[in-house]
Design a protein with these regions (language model features):
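Conserved catalytic-core motifs of eukaryotic protein kinase domains, centered on the activation segment
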Residues: 164, 171-172, 200, 235
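Short, flexible, glycine-rich and Lys/Arg-enriched loop motifs at helix boundaries
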Residues: 89-94, 166-174
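Glycine-rich NAD(P)-binding loop of Rossmann-like domains
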Residues: 173-184
Length: 239
């Protein structure tokens, strides 16, 4: 008897969705909007922590999370990404995660992202989390590559953008380097209302003061402040 593979896949998908809803209810999470996840390997999203004492989801969408994921997008890594966490029992905020065609989200450490945040990983772009904590109103937009290291602590209302999104014409010339990768190394503290722009490399142990606009590299162990941000102290540490 010939087996219709399409029917089997449809049945398997429905079973996984049903199981996922039960899991989310058990751990206190309500329904999130999940679109077009059918062709993504569910083992990348559910129970990849097999064998650990407590099996975890790779992506944990708390109440109010909206995930829009293209079927060709890839999610991998050994960590756990929690979206739209809240300081209070009732959470009035929403958080949006968008993974476009061939986008790559790599989760290598445990990451908590709080409410009212937006994360876009655009076509063929890569976002890497290695662990940390990011407060409300985080805005990450990736057109090339953004890498965020371990123990990175981000305050409220921070924007990280690796692209200008538009070309700039002046003196008969046209800008060509619209996008450039951003690297934030380990143990970095980013203050509230900070903007980090394309091509920036922030070294290990650096601190970015509140309100700074970072357009150039910040060396390891330095404090940068201002618009545009400049190094104002060296050989610092923080806890």
């Amino acid at each position: 008897m010939e087996i219709n593979r399409g029917i089997i896949m449809e049945m398997a998908h429905k079973m996984v969705v049903k199981k996922m809803k039960k899991i989310l209810n058990k751990i206190g999470l309500t329904k999130s909007i999940l679109r077009d996840w059918r062709k993504i390997a569910w083992t990348q999203l559910l129970w990849r922590a097999k064998g650990r004492k407590s099996a975890l989801l790779s992506v944990v969408p708390y109440k109010g999370t909206c995930i829009d994921c293209h079927s060709s997008a890839q999610i991998d890594g050994s960590g756990v990404l929690c979206l739209n966490k809240s300081w209070t029992k009732s959470n009035p905020f929403k958080t949006l995660l968008v993974l476009n065609r061939n986008a790559h989200l790599q989760i290598e450490g445990n990451v908590d992202i709080y409410g009212d945040s937006t994360i876009y990983v655009n076509e063929n772009a890569t976002l890497i989390f290695r662990g940390g904590y990011m407060n409300n109103r985080l805005n990450i937009s990736v057109f090339d590559r953004v890498e965020i290291g371990r123990k990175v602590y981000v305050s409220e209302n921070v924007s990280i953008r690796d692209s200008d999104n538009h070309t700039l014409m002046y003196d008969g010339k046209t800008s060509t380097n619209i996008s450039a990768p951003i690297v934030i190394e380990d143990n970095v503290w980013i203050g509230m209302n900070v903007t980090i722009l394309k091509g920036v490399h922030i070294g290990t142990g650096a601190v970015i003061a509140a309100g700074a606009v970072v357009t150039k590299d910040v060396p390891a162990g330095c404090l940068a402040a201002g618009v545009p941000a400049k190094v104002i102290r060296e050989n610092i540490s923080w806890s």
